């Protein structure tokens, strides 16, 4: 998986999450497209990504409502166009 600049608008949560830290995600994907780690919004971080096959997905924290430490492992949501894509992403992590 890699970060993408393709349009991920329309992806949604299909029940799949990954348990990982912000630091691990930055090492894996680079800096997030959105970073507002103040806990005031539903999302502090998100990445737009694609699989090796070009399937689009997003990774984001959801409703933590607090600043997140770079080293703290939390559940990040996977947003995608289908359940199959989000399951594929989850299985690779």
Predicted regions and their residues:
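Residues within mature, well-folded domains
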Residues: 1-93
